[in-house]
Amino acid sequence: MYSSKENVNILTALLVKFGISKAVVCPGSRNSPIVHNLCTCPDIECFPVTDERSAGFVALGMSLADNEPIALCVTSGSALLNVAPAAAEAFYQKRPLVIISGDRPAQWINQQDGQTLQQHGTLEPNVRKSVTLPEPHNE
């Protein structure tokens, strides 16, 4: 597809396969390969929003208005925490949001350094599923 990171290409292909045609994207370094892929994919229309909390509610509003699942892509660390209010609203309104966060390599998590908090499960219990994609390997 578009990225040198195979897991990003697989993610993009799966989003398209399962009916994602719109994505709200926020700037960041950790999610930049994902944002680039989404925004160059001819099957996905991207809507950039700078503030993650606002982006969450923009995505929720789009899901309500269009009655379709919307992807929301943010960077690592506290950016994911900022979408928690919209994630909770979407969960209780039964509106499909696919929330994607770019994260640091696993060995960098929980190192008492800024923006290295645990991402997996951060939005639970207000999401139906939380998954972590495997990191790409050079094998």
Which residues are covered by each model-predicted region?
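N-terminal alpha/beta PP-like core and its mobile active-site loop of ThDP/TPP-dependent enzymes
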Residues: 1-139
